[in-house]
Design a protein with these regions (language model features):
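Long, intrinsically disordered, low-complexity Ser/Thr/Pro-rich regulatory/activation regions
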Residues: 203-234
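N-terminal strand-loop-strand
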Residues: 7-48
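Short helix-coil junctions and helix-kink-helix linkers
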Residues: 172-181
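RNA substrate-recognition surfaces in RNA-acting enzymes
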Residues: 182-213
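Conserved Nudix-box catalytic region and its N-terminal flanking loop in Nudix hydrolases
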Residues: 31-72, 85, 152-172
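Short, His- and charge-rich active-site/binding loops that engage polyanionic ligands
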Residues: 34, 39-41, 45, 52, ...
């Protein structure tokens, strides 16, 4: 980086902190959950908070978010998307700080439980989310709204499921995200009409003796359809 002259406009500007806060969604036994932790710095130390960090000088915002997610969950290469910028002047009483929020979708059985416990993090069902610090509850509301919009035309919901899943599990996920009951027959019919599920010669017998066939999402086929302009609309 080139050294700046003392009279440079850059030097004269007030210093504003940049942070990233991560809204981490997981899906467990029919329930959509969020990962939060007890804040470890003042102000509001000990209060419930989204996981996050200040952005270091040498990293981008997505890199900072990936660093935080690895630190708290032990996971890499997970779905991550920028949500929006939160820049209210008085949003943080500690200092002037802009937060660029990201939302992440993880397979809840894949995370490192020791890492989560080490940082005092905890999963909460949506309806049980406590009051969080700063504007973090607003971030959750916005992230949930984005997730609902996105899952109507993009297959990102599969990021929350195991690699092998049943159609009832997938339906349960969409019902949890959209907070509505779906018709079993119509959901299955529409889902299978996309021809994007690979039926496996395996069954999940955890809920019945007969069991339900397991499927895998065909990402390769979806990419080709997406390139041709066909959307995944449920």
């Amino acid at each position: 980086m080139t050294a700046l002259e003392n009279n440079s406009p850059y030097i004269a500007q007030p210093k504003i902190l940049v942070a990233t806060d991560c809204i981490v969604f997981g899906f467990d036994e029919g329930i959509l959950k969020l990962l939060v932790f007890r804040r470890r710095i003042d102000p509001l130390k000990g209060e419930w908070s989204l996981i996050g960090s200040f952005v270091n000088e040498e990293e981008s915002v997505p890199d900072a978010a990936r660093r935080v997610l690895l630190q708290f969950t032990g996971l890499e290469n997970i779905f991550l998307e920028e949500l929006r910028v939160y820049s209210d002047v008085e949003r943080d009483s500690g200092a002037r700080c802009i937060s660029i929020a990201q939302y992440a979708l993880i397979r809840i059985n894949d995370y490192d439980r020791e890492q989560v416990e080490l940082h005092g993090a905890k999963w909460f069902a949506l309806e049980d989310i406590p009051q969080l610090v700063l504007d973090h509850n607003v971030m959750i509301f916005d992230a949930l709204d984005r997730l609902r919009q996105k899952t109507t035309h993009k297959p990102i919901g599969f990021e929350l499921l195991p690699e092998k899943f049943t159609i009832p599990q997938l339906q349960s996920l969409y019902e949890a995200i959209h907070q509505t009951k779906l018709d079993d027959r119509n959901f299955r019919k529409k889902l299978l009409s996309f021809d994007l599920l690979i039926k496996l010669d395996e069954k999940d017998k955890s809920t019945s003796k007969k069991g339900a066939f397991l499927y895998r999402f065909d990402y390769g086929k979806y990419k080709k359809l997406e390139e041709s302009g066909i959307n995944f609309v449920l």
